[in-house]
Amino acid sequence: MKIAITDANIFIDLIKLQWLGYLFCIDIEIYTTLEVINELIDDQLERVTIFIQSRQLNIYSFSSSELEQIMQMAAPAALTMQDKSVVFLAKNIQAGVLSGDNPLRKFCAKQNLEVK
């Protein structure tokens, strides 16, 4: 099964469209990072938590040394810590990235990561 890492942009857009459940109907194992989850506001987090509890959404929590590597990652200024955490995880587990964020998409492409 393919693995994809999502950013907050995907969750926010799908929640606004009331399509979040469809993300978990595709044949892809979905991961995100704790940093991305912490970026969501309460209402968004409540909707995403259902998929965390049902183990359809996997949350990766970085070690302190991994967080240090993420902070030191050379990346465009437009990328947040959360964005860089998505790239770091995708590289480490050889996964694709799901994002609608243009700066993140461009950076992923430069890193030879599959991005949709």
Cite the ranges covered by each PLM segment.
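Active-site-proximal, substrate-binding regions of enzyme catalytic domains
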Residues: 2-95, 102-106, 111-113
